[in-house]
Amino acid sequence: MTGRAFAIPLRTRFRGITVREGMLVRGAAGWGEFSPFAEYGPRECARWWAACYEAAELGWPAPVRDTVPVNATVPAVGPEEAARIVASSGCTTAKVKVAERGQSEANDVARVEAVRDALGPRGRVRIDVNGAWDVDTAVRMIRLLDRFELEYVEQPCATVDELAEVRRRVSVPIAADESIRRAEDPLRVRDAEAADVVVLKVQPLGGVRAALRLAEECGLPVVVSSAVETSVGLAAGVALAAALPELPYACGLATLRLLHADVCDDPLLPVHGVLPVRRVDVSEQRLAEVEIDPAAWQARLAAARAAWEQVEREPGP
């Protein structure tokens, strides 16, 4: 397999970053993406490598649907921009980032209100906190924001125990993201009755097949989301969503517009709120426009691959 590194600016700061970097790898089955965030060490990156290898060399399970419903993603922007993002998305569900650095509670309320107004009464609004609140703040803010009829609240607090306590104290469903994808034991969310919904992301979980196994073991409704990837990475998320037996919620896979560019001539963009289930091919010209020196990413990939091989050699529980 050969790899090529990329760096693509984001339109708006997202998860504290302004540029999305990674590596695209081509194998017998097609293209795979390896794009763990900068703070992740080799052991955490190992699962991202496994997902990339699966996409490039093994391919994905057969789909059970041809399209995947998706939500608009609204970063920490002002209310006017939030409304514009939703109106131009074609989606009837929106996920709104709240509790971001530099944003006040008043900013969050105004953003969620603007999204609700843009969607109308039949649209669905969910918020994503990325674990930023403590329990009491979470309970207070969820009750405050639920006047906009929240579909669910994603990762209001950082720990599983906190999620469980918040879930007991509010009526809005709770979704777990970081407590699944960054956990040594992702099933603890289920065992602690800490969530109503689980958010699964292909790269952090080690691939489509690994995520399907986790979904089956967990037994909770699943939302598939992206890790702010190019169309290559998004195609893996679409493959997971397409292979799930049930898909009760819109998925967080319409994130390509967060990037200033893509690597495909035919990018994975939603039409009328859905994404098609398909592989993508990388455009040589578009990749060349965002390509960077691969040395640092080759080193990260090699370390992740070595860590994955070590994990594979370890005895099971």
Curated annotation (Swiss-Prot):
Annotated 2-succinylbenzoate binding sites: 71-73, 95, 128-130, 201
Domain of life where this protein originates: Bacteria
Effect upon mutating residue 73 to V: 1111-fold decrease in catalytic efficiency
UniProt keyword Lyase present: yes
Entry's EC annotation: 4.2.1.113
Keyword Metal-binding (UniProt): yes
A molecular function GO annotation: magnesium ion binding
Binding annotation for Mg(2+): 128, 154, 177
UniProt-annotated catalytic positions: 97 (proton donor), 201 (proton acceptor)
SMART domains: MR_MLE
Recorded metabolic or biological pathway in which this protein acts: Quinol/quinone metabolism; 1,4-dihydroxy-2-naphthoate biosynthesis; 1,4-dihydroxy-2-naphthoate from chorismate: step 4/7; Quinol/quinone metabolism; menaquinone biosynthesis
Catalytic activity line of the entry: (1R,6R)-6-hydroxy-2-succinyl-cyclohexa-2,4-diene-1-carboxylate = 2-succinylbenzoate + H2O
Reported impact of residue 73 to L: 2-fold decrease in catalytic efficiency. 33-fold decrease in catalytic efficiency
EC top class, as a word: lyase
Cofactors required: a divalent metal cation
Protein family membership: Belongs to the mandelate racemase/muconate lactonizing enzyme family. MenC type 1 subfamily.
Domain text: The 20s loop, a flexible loop in the active site that permits ligand binding and release in most enolase superfamily proteins, has a four-amino acid deletion and is well-ordered in T.fusca OSBS.
Function in brief: Converts 2-succinyl-6-hydroxy-2,4-cyclohexadiene-1-carboxylate (SHCHC) to 2-succinylbenzoate (OSB). Does not show N-succinylamino acid racemase (NSAR) activity with N-succinyl-L-phenylglycine as substrate.
PANTHER family found in the cross-reference section: O-SUCCINYLBENZOATE SYNTHASE (PTHR48073:SF2), O-SUCCINYLBENZOATE SYNTHASE-RELATED (PTHR48073)
Quaternary structure and interacting proteins, as annotated: Monomer.
Protein name: o-succinylbenzoate synthase
Organism per entry: Thermobifida fusca (strain YX)
